[in-house]
Amino acid sequence: MANVSMRDMLQAGVHFGHQTRYWNPKMKPFIFGARNKVHIINLEKTVPLFNNALNYIGSVASKKGKILFVGTKRAASDSVRDAAVKCDQFYVNKRWLGGMLTNWKTVRQSIKRLKDLEQQSQDGTFDKITKKEVLMLQREMAKLENSLGGIKNMGGLPDCLFVVDADHEHIAITEARNLGIPVVSIVDTNSNPDGVDYIIPGNDDAIRAVQLYLNSAADAVIEGREKNIEVQAEEGEFVEAAE
């Protein structure tokens, strides 16, 4: 599994936390010190924790598990989508709708509505109704795509969440926790690490840092999937040899 080095993290600014006055005391074990009233994260703690989290994500992917990338703030939104698309996984990058996991039955109905509208827009149904009706349906479709587009093909609850900002996405983490879904999350010095199974202490605002986390996670998923294919191929060879 590809490992991320301390040099990579330093260059991306992973070690810069928040201003000291905003800190969460529960993050004390992961803080090296402070400089100019800004907490410095101890990368000697972060590096092994991050690589352990990547190994876990890779193992989920190797078992064909579904990974949901979550990051709805502006600094993370595009990178979250790009990473999920890169490794053929799922994402929420605009707004976390309350109950997205805990009320999956209702979410599934909304996804069905989105897919029905997509079908209607392609099969000629829109040609048979008024322009005003088409406009209303297009707006509804765009709204649904905006909030559910990244999970419309998930086909059920995810096996794991990869969260960019534990503080900003606390509702998603709580829902996952209630359902027993493991959570991997970037946790900055102002955040509460409770409820996170795989804590990655690090800067959750710098775009370069966010991209480092997400690209590494996407690569771990891809490697995990490839490992699964290799194992299946080997098992196939054993079966042939036995015959």
Swiss-Prot record:
Biological process according to GO: translation
Gene Ontology cellular component list: cytosolic small ribosomal subunit
GO molecular function per UniProt: structural constituent of ribosome
Keyword tags: Ribonucleoprotein, Ribosomal protein
Coiled coil stretches, renumbered: none
Superkingdom assignment: Bacteria
Listed Pfam families: Ribosomal_S2 (PF00318)
PROSITE patterns: RIBOSOMAL_S2_1 (PS00962), RIBOSOMAL_S2_2 (PS00963)
PANTHER family: 30S RIBOSOMAL PROTEIN S2 PROKARYOTIC AND ORGANELLAR, SMALL RIBOSOMAL SUBUNIT PROTEIN US2M
HAMAP family: Ribosomal_uS2_B
Family (UniProt): Belongs to the universal ribosomal protein uS2 family.
Protein name: Small ribosomal subunit protein uS2
Organism of derivation: Pseudoalteromonas atlantica (strain T6c / ATCC BAA-1087)
